């Protein structure tokens, strides 16, 4: 109550911020006559003047009014477009490192030019991030004349470019590209052979277009550069054939009613006891499992994983919903955007299982060479901001994870769109009949209609229904993405009907009456008369559509996220145009079936609705919204869970990448090598000669063999001890360090210090890269199995942090050990040998950098498993107790506690 009164008196925080920025707009508007009076050359010269003032110590904030006024004036001259005051407010929001929520059609691309220009003045580069290559190249070409008029350079990055082309694009003042490409270039740069091979500069400032799509929807998908792994792909086919013989439980409550239980919410499969026994029998008959072997024995866990993947592929992943088959390949369909994600693959054998199900070529699994997440990549920028039409519903997540505030920017003209109440039907059949009738009604009135669907399957089903009812229409989904811009450009014509999956066509406005510019572009060198005729015809159509009520948007079902529903609604009523929206639902829709309340179902059954009758009630709308909030909350928890796990890897990644950069930048690593050599040798001696111990506790024969084997040191330790009765530990250490130092000195003298420094650098980089790749593999294995700790009453997150730290400590130790071992053994004789080593390393890295394959991790399932196991452990991260080691710490050179007789590092402490 008190909050409401205060808000009425002083306004909300958003309103106060808008008011503050509107005052700044007055200062910008006051400068307009001054800049209008300047000629083109004087206006362009302002850029150089601003840069000089920045170098002299003036801040960007101080320059803002003049810089924005310059951009506005340049835009008027070059593009014939003047920034509105609300667009100035949007530009200030972006400059301050926030998210600007602007409704569809409010000119987000033009808003971006203000903050881009101001921040590009620093010379550190500005990245404009888009969701696909089409939008990146379109926006770059559209805005290039404006930026070049102002004396700024513009570059575009896309996959397939050479390193030189990319380097040139990043060297520009402004660089356009997709989130994937920026992220992959960051990973590739950290696999570069030399500093000169890197393409990116420092990550200074980024503006993300459709920020919700990239930072929220894409947050589950890690960026992974991977290489193929040797494996038996025929295994997937054989398991796929066996999985057909397993039957789903007819009653979820009765595990004896089938072989496995499906969990549709989490897309998981659980074998029943009956199914487990049946599967073992099938595997034995197929000679894939020994007669006395168990499916759950350690060596057969991979087999069990294959079976789970095959069952999930067959029963939970559906063609034309989760993926399509195109040109003999299984291509994932993004659940949020409805777009195909070429090159992306599900992990953990799931993609291969789907390929086996569809009978297409099975591609090999891959090994991670480098990885990060969009969440952690974009947090590397000094300043980050974004634009979207729908961010307010996710404001909490933007604030908590990225530290970004959301500002809702007022529309230039009032919104007059009418959002009708949802209509809920008992069955899907009745719902689709009602949609067809609504489409017919709106077409007869001369209104264009956009029908939004959640899947390709639904869009194609609706298309068939429309064919049966002889309704002309266009379909826009992942299968027709090439013609996307053309279809969207004419979707606003009178009576036009367009069926589109979730977000297809995002970034392109539906102009009422169609787009005359697209028609003109299709003509070869059109005359002025032809253009005028096109404009006149468009104006007539435009006026007719306005009079009929504007664009009508139909939602064929509610999405899991209210934000995606709002994006669909936002296609209508742009820039103050009239428009309307309505969602048609049924109790058979996924959202209602999996998350909706039983109360709605009971109410509808109690009402005894006739076939074709719908319910339109606030209680139903509230139930739908509650279901959506429930799903949004669950998805937020999953993304947060993933981020908390990746933060551990991210800290390690930063350390390794920083060390790698230091090695690349160094010309002389001899002092580092000497320091590492002393440390590694001291640790080796301590394993056999414990510090401050009696001579009786020494293992000199063991140390002698170890030094010969590992460090090429042939020293008669036993003889030294026998010949000198005063032989003590300090003397032993001193002599061994002298011998080892002498070995390195003689190697350097044999080839010359310069060649030795080059060789040391290549060895250091090769060991670092090899061990890091192995470490990533071990981190993957650790993360996938960590949820099981919850069932042992341990907190999986704390366990993961502890074990990841131990793995990282082992990684650093192994890197040092390997570097010294290799340098101790290898003798360089000629310069050609080092040249050849450098050539081989460069070729390997170029090959690996070329294989940038985004893997669509099945992260949701693993994150949910972790959350579930944390509940099982009975504690959360907040109340977790400090983790203490159960037994004494085992050194790398100690005997392994498993009793094998091997050293720990050659047994359970071995990383590969």
Swiss-Prot record:
Against PROSITE patterns, the record matches this protein to: SECA, SECA_MOTOR_DEAD
Report the EC number(s), separated by commas if there are several. 7.4.2.8
* Bias kind Basic and acidic residues: ranges: 847-859, 881-892
Pfam name, any one? SecA_SW
Q: Give any Gene Ontology cellular component.
A: plasma membrane
Q: What membrane topology term does the record carry?
A: Peripheral membrane protein
Q: Do you know which PANTHER family this protein is assigned to? A: CHLOROPLAST PROTEIN-TRANSPORTING ATPASE, SECA INNER MEMBRANE COMPONENT OF SEC PROTEIN SECRETION SYSTEM
Q: Which HAMAP family match?
A: SecA
List the protein's name. Answer: Protein translocase subunit SecA
């Amino acid at each position: 109550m008190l909050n409401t009164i205060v808000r009425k008196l002083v306004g909300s925080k958003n309103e106060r911020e808008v008011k503050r920025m509107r005052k700044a707009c007055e200062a910008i508007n006051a400068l307009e006559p001054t800049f209008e009076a300047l000629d083109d050359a004087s206006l362009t010269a302002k850029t150089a003047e601003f840069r000089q003032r920045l170098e002299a110590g003036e801040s960007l904030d101080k320059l803002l009014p003049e810089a924005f006024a310059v951009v506005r004036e340049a835009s008027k001259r070059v593009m014939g477009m003047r920034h509105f005051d609300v667009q100035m407010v949007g530009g200030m929001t972006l400059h301050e490192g926030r998210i600007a929520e602007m409704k569809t059609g409010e000119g987000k691309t033009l808003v971006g030019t203000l903050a881009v220009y101001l921040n590009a003045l620093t010379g550190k580069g500005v990245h404009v991030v888009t969701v696909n290559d089409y939008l990146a190249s379109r926006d770059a070409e559209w805005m290039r004349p404006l930026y070049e008029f102002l004396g700024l350079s513009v570059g575009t990055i896309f996959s397939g470019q050479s390193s030189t082309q990319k380097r040139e694009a990043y060297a520009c003042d402004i660089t356009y590209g997709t989130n994937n490409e920026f992220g992959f270039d960051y990973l590739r740069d950290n696999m570069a052979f030399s500093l000169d091979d890197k393409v990116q500069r420092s990550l200074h400032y980024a503006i993300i277009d459709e920020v919700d799509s990239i930072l929220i929807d894409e947050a589950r998908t890690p960026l992974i550069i991977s290489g193929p792994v040797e494996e038996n792909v025929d295994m997937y086919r054989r398991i796929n054939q066996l999985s057909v013989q397993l039957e789903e439980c007819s009653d979820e409550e009765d595990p004896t009613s089938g072989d496995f239980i499906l969990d549709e919410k989490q897309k998981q499969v659980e074998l029943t006891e009956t199914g487990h026994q049946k599967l073992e029998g099938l595997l034995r008959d197929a000679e894939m499992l020994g007669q006395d072997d168990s499916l759950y024995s350690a060596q057969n866990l991979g087999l069990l994983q294959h079976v789970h993947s095959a069952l999930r592929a067959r029963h939970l992943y559906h063609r034309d919903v989760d993926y399509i088959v195109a040109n003999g390949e299984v291509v994932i369909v993004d659940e949020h955007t409805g777009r195909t994600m070429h090159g992306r693959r599900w992990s953990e054998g799931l993609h291969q299982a789907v390929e086996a199900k569809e009978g297409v070529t099975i591609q090999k699994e891959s090994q991670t060479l480098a990885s990060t997440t969009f969440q952690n990549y974009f947090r590397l920028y000094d300043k980050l901001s974004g634009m979207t039409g729908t961010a307010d519903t996710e404001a909490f997540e933007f604030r908590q994870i990225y530290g970004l505030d959301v500002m809702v920017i007022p529309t230039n003209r009032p919104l007059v769109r009418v959002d009708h109440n949802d209509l809920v039907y008992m069955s899907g059949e009745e719902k689709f009949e009602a949609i067809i009738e609504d489409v017919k009604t709106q077409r007869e009135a001369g209104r264009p209609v956009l029908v939004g669907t959640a899947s390709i399957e639904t869009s194609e089903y609706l298309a068939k229904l429309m064919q049966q009812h002889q309704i002309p229409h266009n379909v826009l989904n992942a299968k027709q993405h090439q013609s996307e811009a053309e279809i969207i450009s004419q979707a606003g014509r009178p009576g036009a009907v367009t069926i589109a999956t979730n977000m297809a066509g995002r970034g392109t406005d539906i102009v009422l009456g169609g787009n005359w510019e697209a028609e003109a572009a299709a003509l070869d060198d059109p005359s002025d008369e032809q253009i005028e005729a096109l404009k006149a015809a468009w104006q007539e159509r435009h006026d007719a559509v306005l009079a009929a009520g504007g664009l009508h948007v139909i939602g064929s079902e509610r999405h899991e996220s209210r934000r995606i529903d709002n994006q669909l609604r936002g296609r209508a009523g742009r820039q103050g145009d009239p428009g309307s929206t309505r969602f048609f639902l049924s109790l058979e829709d996924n959202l209602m079936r999996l998350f909706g309340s039983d109360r709605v179902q009971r109410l509808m059954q109690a009402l005894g609705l006739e076939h074709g009758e719908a319910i339109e009630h606030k209680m139903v709308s509230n139930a739908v919204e509650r279901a959506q909030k429930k799903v949004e909350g669950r998805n937020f928890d999953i993304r947060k869970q993933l981020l908390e796990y990746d933060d551990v890897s991210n800290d390690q990644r930063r350390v390794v990448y920083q060390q790698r950069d230091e090695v690349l930048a160094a010309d002389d690593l001899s002092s580092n090598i000497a320091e590492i050599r002393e440390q590694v040798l001291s640790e080796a001696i301590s394993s056999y000669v414990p510090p401050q111990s009696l001579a009786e506790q020494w293992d000199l024969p063991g140390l002698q063999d170890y030094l010969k084997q590992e460090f090429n040191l042939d020293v008669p330790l036993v003889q030294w001890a026998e010949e000198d009765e005063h032989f003590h530990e300090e003397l032993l250490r001193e002599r061994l360090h002298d011998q080892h130092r002498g070995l390195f000195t003689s190697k350097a003298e044999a080839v010359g210090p310069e060649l030795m420094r080059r060789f040391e650098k290549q060895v250091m980089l090769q060991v670092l890269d090899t061990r890091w790749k192995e470490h990533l593999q071990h981190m993957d294995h650790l993360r996938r199995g960590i949820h099981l700790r919850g069932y042992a009453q341990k907190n999986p997150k704390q366990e993961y942090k502890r074990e990841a730290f131990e793995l990282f400590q082992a990684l650093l130790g192994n890197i040092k050990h390997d570097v010294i071992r290799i340098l101790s053994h290898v003798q360089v004789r000629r310069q050609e040998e080092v040249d050849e080593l450098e050539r081989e390393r460069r070729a390997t890295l170029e090959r690996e950098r070329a294989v940038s394959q985004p893997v669509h991790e099945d992260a949701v399932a693993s994150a949910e498993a972790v959350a579930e196991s944390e509940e099982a452990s009975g504690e959360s991260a907040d109340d977790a107790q400090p983790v203490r080691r159960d037994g004494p710490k085992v050194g790398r050179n100690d005997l392994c506690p498993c009793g094998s007789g091997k050293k720990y590092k050659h047994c359970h402490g071995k990383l590969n």
